[in-house]
């Protein structure tokens, strides 16, 4: 998956854009969808919309200034971080356990110089009570949407 600003996007080059960041087979289906809130095209391979798209589509609806939205399916973390109306980070990570999820989220926040103690983290996936307790040690608030 890749997000390409509309000013650089050419539909005929969608496969090339994607091939620069992920390995795709020659016969893989490549799709793109315009995301007006970012003035960019979300490009992905396969017939199923990736969870990261849903994260990005919903990120702007969060009321907080520092927006942290995650989806974790037990294997992959989809993470979107925004500040105000700006998208700061959009990525996926292999995360087989919740400690790995925490690592990637906190690393991203550190690299963006955002203070988790002043931020609400939101998940679009269910969390165990133990996972929520762990999050409350680092974040001002935890929300499951």
Tell where the protein language model's regions lie, with residue ranges.
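Hydrophobic/aromatic-enriched cytosolic interaction surfaces used to assemble or bind macromolecules
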Residues: 1-145
């Amino acid at each position: 998956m890749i997000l390409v600003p509309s000013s650089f996007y050419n539909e005929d080059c969608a496969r090339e854009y994607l091939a620069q960041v992920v390995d795709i087979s020659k016969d893989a289906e490549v799709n793109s969808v315009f995301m007006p809130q970012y003035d960019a095209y979300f490009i992905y391979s396969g017939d199923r919309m990736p969870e990261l798209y849903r994260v990005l589509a919903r990120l702007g609806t969060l009321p907080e200034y520092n927006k942290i939205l995650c989806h974790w399916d037990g294997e992959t973390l989809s993470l979107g971080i925004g500040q105000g109306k700006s998208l700061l980070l959009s990525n996926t990570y292999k995360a087989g356990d919740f400690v790995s999820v925490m690592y990637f989220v906190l690393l991203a926040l550190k690299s963006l110089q955002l203070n988790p103690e002043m931020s609400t983290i939101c998940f679009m996936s269910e969390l165990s009570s133990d996972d929520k307790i762990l999050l409350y040690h680092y974040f001002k608030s935890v929300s499951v949407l």
